[in-house]
A protein has these predicted regions:
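Amphipathic interaction/junction segments at domain boundaries or subunit interfaces
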Residues: 47-141, 164
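Short, mixed-charge aromatic SLiMs
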Residues: 32-38, 74-78, 171-174
Length: 181
């Protein structure tokens, strides 16, 4: 997993549950990740999964809920980092619609080992975006959280339905985001 994501996971855990929990997660799992993970390297997916499971166990939160909250937390950082390649007039649904072409392709070009999820997004109407999410990591909860985080950033409200999900055995997650007026 990309170091930026792991670094943001650390920031999320520290901000929501304290530095002590982050250090305890690292100790309990035996995962060898620095106190502050480097953003310019890749981390083993299994290590990150172990950290998330440890955070869920220690906080008493459901892992999927925790991942969705992390996605919401992550959205503003992603917007700051990728602002130069996003159009200034774009809002929530526009950013979601163009995430694959504008962000994920750039990430893959910059680092051949980076493996962001594959997204296919289409607008079925002015206020609806439909996203197919495919990734062996099966972190659709993070994607949902990012979508909510984008809406919060743009002072919009977004209802997300998920008719299919990798975690339920479907071949892909389908996320349908509808702006609420």
């Amino acid at each position: 997993m990309h170091g930026l994501i792991v670094n943001q996971l650390r920031q999320f855990v520290v901000r929501t549950h304290g530095r002590k929990l982050w250090n305890r997660m690292r100790a309990d799992t035996g995962v060898e990740i620095a106190e502050v993970p480097a953003i310019d390297r890749l981390y083993e997916d299994a290590d990150v999964v172990a950290l998330v499971q440890a955070a869920a166990a220690a906080s008493g939160a459901d892992a999927q809920v925790l991942l969705e909250q992390f996605g919401e937390f992550l959205a503003p950082a992603l917007l700051r980092i990728y602002a130069p390649i996003l159009r200034p007039e774009w809002r929530t649904l526009d950013v979601i619609q163009h995430a694959e072409a504008r962000i994920h392709r750039v990430v893959r070009r910059q680092d051949a080992q980076a493996a962001p999820p594959y997204l296919t997004a289409t607008r079925s109407s002015a206020d609806v975006v439909e996203v197919n999410y495919e990734s062996p990591r099966r972190l659709c909860a993070v994607a949902r959280g990012i979508m909510h985080g984008l809406a919060t950033h743009f002072n919009e409200r977004l209802d997300i339905q998920q008719p299919t999900c990798l975690l339920r055995g479907d071949p892909a997650c389908r996320l349908v985001g509808r702006l609420i007026s």
